[in-house]
Amino acid sequence: MEPKFILGSSSPRRKLILEYFRIPFTCIPSNFEEHSVPYHGDPVAYSQELAIGKAESIVKDHNPEGLILTADTVVAYQGKIFNKPGSYDEAIEMLKTLSGQTHAVITSIALLQDRKLVTGEETTQVTFTQLPEAYLGRYIKAFSTLDKCGAYSIQEGGSLIIHNIQGCAYNVQGLPIKTLKHLLLEFNVDLWDYLV
């Protein structure tokens, strides 16, 4: 019997990735307060704590039957993390900082079912082109990037600002399929079974 998947996210990109791989799921966005988790300088540990918090929040609030999948993506550069910008001005500053530089995109995944918790993460290195300041505002407005970590999107105009990617492109979109495939095996679920 196929497991019932619960995606603990309202991210349209994560939904599209699951749909692309024909994984059936129900969406129950988490109410977890991400700002309640302090950042102590380790972006992997931070994103992992957020992913776990989201999964546990869904159990607490809804107690659904099924395999809960949550994820958290952060952009990290020189010891700082860049979440979703709080304003247009913050988005401009993020893009200025990342312009011409290489940063890490880290996504942590948490899978939770019947008190069994499995976690994993993926890191991708992304290098931006040198971005003319005059174009930053245009990019943010044209591609509505205020709801995206680091104030940018790989799939929406990413080719205008990204010079190079080393690693998983799905990770930069918010759900690294290779990592998810590996973690699902812990629940005896093989993604290949959905590709028929």
Curated annotation (Swiss-Prot):
Q: Name one GO cellular component term.
A: cytoplasm
Q: State any GO BP term from the record.
A: nucleotide metabolic process
EC number, as in UniProt: 3.6.1.9
Annotated positions for site Important for substrate specificity: R13, T73, Q155
Which keywords accompany this UniProt record? Cytoplasm, Hydrolase, Nucleotide metabolism
Catalyses which reaction(s): dTTP + H2O = dTMP + diphosphate + H(+); UTP + H2O = UMP + diphosphate + H(+)
User: A single GO molecular function, which one?
Assistant: UTP diphosphatase activity
Q: Where in the cell is it found?
A: Cytoplasm
> Which EC class, in a word?
hydrolase
Q: Which family does it belong to?
A: Belongs to the Maf family. YhdE subfamily.
Matching HAMAP family: Maf (MF_00528)
Cited NCBIfam families: maf
Q: What does this protein do?
A: Nucleoside triphosphate pyrophosphatase that hydrolyzes dTTP and UTP. May have a dual role in cell division arrest and in preventing the incorporation of modified nucleotides into cellular nucleic acids.
* Descriptive protein name: dTTP/UTP pyrophosphatase
